[in-house]
């Protein structure tokens, strides 16, 4: 009887230990999967950096700017096709953060709600969504706040591209751009994502 009780106690102890180990392994597996997914999303976003739809300015035909990642006004996002050469934002850029400095580019952007680890880098990625939309009221409603990049396919348009949140501004045309063949060019929603280390 004493031997049976001793064996039963050993089996109960073994089952409890296996159950605890299994729970810890499941938690560790969840953390690994979360990390893997975060890296996948980050890699996909960085790979899209600089994708501005069908637009390619050509070699040496563009001036690059670095607007604030907090900028929300379409006119200040770094796109300007009225200049020669045209102006576009940097696709991917990094800048340091140093809490002891007040120099431009070394301070935390005003729109960041999370804390940024001191003396670390902030990576900003800019691109348009890979899926374009037709310029219609259903896709870009009145009062829209998302900036859209529209690229002209028509040699008769005075601008090669236009950035706006207002559907009425998106008037550039596709290839067959005269007479009955004239159709509005599609537009791409614009995205700016910032990555940083949080303490």
Question: What positions do the PLM features span?
Answer:
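Aliphatic-rich helix starts adjacent to a transmembrane/signal segment
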Residues: 1-43, 47-49
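N-terminal pilin/flagellin-like segments and related low-complexity appendage regions
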Residues: 38-199
């Amino acid at each position: 009887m004493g031997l049976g009780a001793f064996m039963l106690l050993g089996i109960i102890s073994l089952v409890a230990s296996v159950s605890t180990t299994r729970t810890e392994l499941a938690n560790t597996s969840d953390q690994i999967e979360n990390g893997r997914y975060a890296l996948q999303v980050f890699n996909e976003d960085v790979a899209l950096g600089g994708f501005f739809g069908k637009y390619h300015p050509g070699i040496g035909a563009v001036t690059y700017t670095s607007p604030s990642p907090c900028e929300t006004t379409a006119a200040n996002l770094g796109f300007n096709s009225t200049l020669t050469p045209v102006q576009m934002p940097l696709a991917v850029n990094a800048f340091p953060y140093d809490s002891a400095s007040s120099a431009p580019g070394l301070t935390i952007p005003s729109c960041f709600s999370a804390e940024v680890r001191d003396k670390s880098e902030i990576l900003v990625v800019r691109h348009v969504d890979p899926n374009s939309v037709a310029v219609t009221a259903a896709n870009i409603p009145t009062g829209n706040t998302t900036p859209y990049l529209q690229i002209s396919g028509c040699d008769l348009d005075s601008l090669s591209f236009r950035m706006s949140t207002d559907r009425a501004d998106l008037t550039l045309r596709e290839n067959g751009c005269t007479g009955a063949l004239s159709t509005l060019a599609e537009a791409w929603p614009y995205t700016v994502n910032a990555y940083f280390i949080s303490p």
